[in-house]
Design a protein with these regions (language model features):
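SAM-dependent transferase fold signal centered on methyltransferase-like domains
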Residues: 1-302
Length: 302
């Protein structure tokens, strides 16, 4: 995400300095902005050997004067001062929509860290000049949404990526979203494949399935099928045991997964008295709004 050759970063939302430290580990010199006096002292102490500059002020009030930067980094606060949760349609404080143009006069690149609950289509609508959007997960749980916006727009389309890391920060996969023509299977085949949340968030499910040789069960449904066993990184893989037009009466336990289905998981679990099971799964599907429903009983294999 950090542009190649970037040496000086302005971190407008330094907080305790975790992200600041990350930039410094990449060899960057960082200017930090933080209004809390206690955190300012912490930032100064922890940065005493790194050449770090700390500015005690709010991000909205900071002015760089004659300083120049390669990247401006902003992680907007997702809580109001009252402690109330900001709606996900609100990008937080400082609001990038209000200040982006100013930040781009300070550096050729702005890097935003947003709530991972923000939809990629909203990101592309709000920041049409973004050249890179990354949904970052750790052990399959989406943790962050990173958006990179250059001062000079690229002629290329915005690149969307799903990236997963292990607990030590090592990448386990990096999967791009791309426009692909995915074949539709005539029926559910011997195996099904469920993409990770980061892939779904980035819109990379179809490109992952295409690269893995899977087929679509239904257009727009983030579940795929194949005739072969797979351990492709980026999702969970299952062997199909049976397919039904209704939930089997003898199914006593299963983890329930819904795909474009009108009823919620807990409602189905209560209605049919199905206990939790970590190995056997019930996939409840509906093929489009008002379409046919089907139920797949499957065993997880990877």
């Amino acid at each position: 995400m950090i542009p190649e050759g970037a040496q000086r970063v302005l971190d407008l939302t330094a907080g305790s300095g975790i992200d600041t430290w990350g930039f410094e580990q990449h060899g960057c010199r960082v200017d930090c902005v933080e209004p809390d006096p206690y955190l300012v002292e912490l930032l100064k102490w922890n940065g005493r050997t790194t050449g770090r500059s700390v500015h005690e002020t709010k991000a909205e009030d900071f002015r760089p004067h004659s300083a120049t930067f390669d990247t401006v980094y902003v992680d907007p606060s997702r809580r109001e001062t009252s402690g109330a949760r900001i709606d996900f349609s609100d990008l937080g404080e400082p609001n990038p929509l209000e200040h982006l143009e100013t930040w781009l006069t300070w550096a050729p690149t702005v890097l935003l860290k947003l709530s991972p609950m923000v939809d990629r289509r909203a990101v592309q609508r709000w920041f049409p000049n973004a050249d890179l959007v990354v949904y970052l997960s750790r052990k399959r749980e989406v943790k962050e949404l990173l958006v990179r916006i250059p001062r000079v727009p690229s002629a290329a389309a915005t690149q969307l990526l799903a990236v997963d890391t292990d607990p030590f920060g090592t990448e386990t996969y990096r999967i791009p979203a791309s426009e692909v023509r995915l074949p539709s299977a005539p029926e559910v085949l011997g195996f099904i494949h469920d993409p990770d949340p980061a892939l779904r968030a980035a819109g990379a499910g179809d490109s992952w399935a295409h690269a893995s040789g899977f087929e679509a069960i239904h257009p727009g449904m983030s579940l795929y099928t194949s005739r072969f066993h797979s351990t492709a990184p980026g999702g969970r893989h299952f062997a199909v045991e049976s397919v039904h037009s209704h939930i089997p009466k003898d199914l006593k336990s299963a983890s329930i997964v819904t795909k474009t289905f009108p009823e919620k998981v807990e409602a189905l679990r209560t209605k049919y008295g199905i206990r939790e099971d970590s190995e056997r799964f019930l996939f409840a599907l509906q093929r489009g709004t008002g379409g046919a429903k089907s139920y797949i009983v499957a065993r997880r294999i990877h």
